[in-house]
Structures are given as C-alpha cells and as structure tokens.
Amino acid sequence: MKRKGFIMTVYPDKHDEYEKRHNEIWPEMVAELKKHGAHNYSIFLDKQTNQLFGYIEIEDEEKWSKMAETSINQKWWKFMKPVMKTNSDDSPVSTDLTEVFHMD
C-alpha cells in the first residue's frame, strides 16, 4: 500500500454541507473507490483555515490514477463543486503532501 496525503479547500460557509454530502456518499462512489484500490480513506477539516486534509492508502498509482476518468467520479466532482475550490475540469484543487514521518 502507498500512503497519500493531500490538502483541499472547502468554502467557509459550506463546512456543514461538505460533511453532509460525505456522510451521504453514494454507494456507487464508494464501490468505485474500492475498485480503484482505495483503502483507509479519511478527510479532516480545519474550520479555522477551511483546509481539508485527506489521507488515503492506495494499492497502485496507475490503478488509482484511472479513478478520475470514471463517470461516477466526474459526477461526484460536479456535485461537490458548489462547496469547494475546483479546477476548470471540476476536480478539486488539491495539493499533494510529502510524507516526512511514519510509524506502524
């Protein structure tokens, strides 16, 4: 497994809506994440900075990279666009982080 950390940004007045949408995540989205090798996926919110910290473990970069191309993922991005910063293709603006420490 490869561990990945990343930062995204939720709009200041959309914290509750962001959480609600994830609490009600579509079963087909979860299935697609798993199909593309996602495990142990969590997102944390810093309410003071509006930053989201995502942590995910993936089986393989190539397999994971294909997730963005799926129709359900494209639909999810459009659904989430009103609550967070996004790119022109509706994907979340995201910054990958460098792991500097790990302990099992």
From Swiss-Prot:
SUPFAM superfamilies: Dimeric alpha+beta barrel. InterPro entries: Dimeric_a/b-barrel, L-rhamnose_mutarotase, Rham/fucose_mutarotase. It is found in: Cytoplasm. One of its GO terms (cellular component) is cytoplasm. One of its GO terms (molecular function) is L-rhamnose mutarotase activity. It catalyses: alpha-L-rhamnose = beta-L-rhamnose. The active site is at 22 (proton donor). Keywords: Carbohydrate metabolism, Cytoplasm, Isomerase, Rhamnose metabolism. GO terms for biological process: rhamnose catabolic process. Its EC number is 5.1.3.32. It comes from the Bacteria. Pathway: Carbohydrate metabolism; L-rhamnose metabolism. The keyword Isomerase applies. Substrate binds at residues 18, 41, 76-77. The keyword Oxidoreductase does not apply. It is an enzyme of class 5 (isomerase). Involved in the anomeric conversion of L-rhamnose. HAMAP family: L_rham_rotase. NCBIfam families: YiiL_rotase. Homodimer. This is L-rhamnose mutarotase. It comes from Oceanobacillus iheyensis (strain DSM 14371 / CIP 107618 / JCM 11309 / KCTC 3954 / HTE831).
